[in-house]
């Protein structure tokens, strides 16, 4: 894959480790796939780009029920369909440790317009596009089995990437 001549290519990789980034005690397998994709999609959105393709890898222990893997994949695939991403391939390996999922995402942005942290300068205005601590509050509510906090729980389990907003902010400069 290569970007069109008038586009720059973007790439990002995110990894989620069972017991560190997710737990089946408070997340359904489908939600794990959704959240993994949102992390990657958000990286492209933060650069003001459009996601195009992914490469997916999983390291799974031999005792894992393949139905769990299938459900995680369904969460990944649903996000890919929603954002019209191609799954180029990947790898599946066995591990004696916890389950590990890695996605490398490829996107594109009009040439010379990518928003990069390295472009930040003293005096720039820095903003956030969602509630600070929202997903962490949801994680706490899930971990301690607290009643209520429904929106923050959803914010942790099924966050939404801000693809359109990232593009709009890039256009504003």
Which residues are covered by each model-predicted region?
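Helix-biased detector of long, well-ordered alpha-helical tracts
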Residues: 1-173
């Amino acid at each position: 894959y290569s970007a069109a001549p008038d586009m720059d290519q973007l790439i990002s990789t995110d990894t989620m480790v069972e017991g560190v980034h997710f737990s089946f005690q408070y997340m359904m397998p489908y939600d794990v796939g959704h959240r993994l994709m949102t992390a990657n999609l958000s990286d492209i959105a933060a650069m003001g780009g459009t996601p195009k393709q992914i490469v997916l890898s999983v390291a799974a222990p031999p005792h894992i029920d393949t139905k769990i893997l299938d459900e995680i994949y369904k969460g990944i695939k649903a996000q890919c369909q929603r954002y019209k991403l191609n799954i180029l391939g990947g790898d599946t390996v066995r591990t004696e440790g916890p389950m590990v999922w890695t996605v490398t995402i490829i996107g594109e942005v009009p040439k010379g317009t990518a928003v990069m942290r390295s472009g930040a300068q003293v005096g720039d205005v820095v903003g956030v596009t969602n509630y600070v601590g929202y997903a962490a509050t949801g994680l706490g509510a899930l971990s301690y089995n607290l009643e209520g906090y429904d929106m923050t729980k959803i914010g942790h389990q099924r966050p939404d990437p801000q693809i359109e907003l990232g593009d709009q902010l890039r256009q504003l400069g």
